[in-house]
């Protein structure tokens, strides 16, 4: 904000802006055509249509230069970048093709993820929040069908051994709270050695604000041989817009897109935290990670209503969102009302399925 203010003051006064006053952090920002980047890092930024770090382009030349009044901003559709800047912003990029997959033992799919983390200095609750924006880019040459995007959180609230989690589907919210009034599995002490909050226990929430955009589906079921598949007048580009997900064929309206919210909320537990079955443990292989993302337990069993959500047998009600009740209401389904005990839960707020095309 000091940089923005200083540039504006120089501009209003009709005097040259002192480029030496620009903080190094702004000159190191990885935005398109940053002329100072190579001075610090001795290599050039890639030239890419995605543009890397988003910024406000003061003179509209498509190039980032803080000495010309440019500054980092939040890339958000429908929001002008000029007024959409936080007090602090961090940008980073990672991909799944640069090294071996030691957690999943899976194969790379050439997915790039660009992340903006940012925060605001305010006098209200926003001061206690941090925000994260993720951009997923398919760098492969083929589309990825049945894509799921998930926010994974290991929400250790002080001592991890006495945590419960829940979800509020009306807000796409995950929250973690303590099992009782003291943080710790032995009074205010924790067997893992973690520092506890003792009798000043907070609550943490992760809000899934917005999901990815996907083409609107005009028809949700088709059979092979359906005459509409041959109707080139009603669907002139039909063979370019077919999508098959979970054995169902869709026609996609590529001119209109809808926002996909949180389609499932799942959790799993650390092995050794309680005596829970192996189907509820942390994933170890690529298919197990995918199952949690797509709303199933580690072994493919669907989540069901009540208890821990792992209820094998006929008559169980299949669900997409686990523990959705208010912990303060014993008649609602929550980990508190189910009295689940020790488990150290980790959560997944997911969106899908959708098709992610290259680029």
Report residues per predicted region.
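Extracellular/surface-associated beta-sandwich interaction domains
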Residues: 1-358
């Amino acid at each position: 904000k000091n940089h923005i203010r200083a540039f504006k003051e120089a501009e209003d006064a009709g005097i040259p802006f002192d480029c030496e006053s620009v903080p190094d952090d702004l000159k190191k920002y990885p935005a398109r055509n940053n002329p100072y980047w190579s001075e610090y890092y001795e290599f050039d930024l890639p030239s890419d249509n995605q543009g890397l770090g988003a910024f406000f382009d003061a003179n509209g030349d498509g190039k980032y230069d803080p000495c010309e009044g440019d500054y980092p901003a939040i890339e958000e559709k429908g929001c002008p970048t000029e007024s959409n800047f936080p007090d602090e912003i961090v940008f980073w990029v990672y991909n799944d093709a640069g090294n071996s997959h030691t957690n999943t033992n899976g194969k790379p799919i050439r997915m790039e993820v660009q992340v903006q983390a940012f925060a605001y200095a305010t006098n209200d609750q926003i001061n206690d929040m941090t925000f994260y924006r993720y951009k997923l880019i398919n760098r492969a040459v083929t589309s990825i069908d049945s894509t799921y995007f998930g926010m994974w959180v290991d929400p250790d609230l002080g001592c991890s051994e006495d945590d419960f989690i829940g979800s509020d589907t009306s807000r796409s919210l995950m929250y973690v709270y303590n099992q009782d009034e003291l943080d710790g599995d032995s009074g205010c002490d924790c067997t893992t050695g973690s520092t506890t909050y003792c009798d000043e226990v907070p609550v943490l929430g992760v809000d899934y604000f917005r999901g990815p955009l996907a083409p609107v589906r005009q028809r949700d079921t088709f059979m092979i041989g359906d005459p509409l598949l041959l109707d080139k007048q009603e669907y002139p580009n039909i063979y370019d817009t077919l999508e098959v997900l979970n054995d169902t064929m869709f026609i996609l309206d590529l001119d209109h897109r809808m926002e996909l919210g949180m389609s499932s909320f799942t959790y799993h537990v650390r092995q050794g935290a309680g005596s829970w079955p192996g189907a509820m443990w942390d994933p170890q292989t690529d298919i197990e990670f995918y199952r949690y993302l797509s709303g199933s337990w580690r072994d493919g069993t669907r989540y069901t209503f009540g208890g821990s959500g792992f209820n094998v047998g006929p008559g169980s009600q299949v669900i997409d969102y686990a523990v959705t009740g208010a912990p303060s209401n014993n008649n609602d389904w929550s980990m508190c009302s189910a009295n689940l005990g020790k488990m150290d839960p980790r959560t997944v707020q997911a969106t899908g399925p959708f098709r992610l095309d290259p680029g």
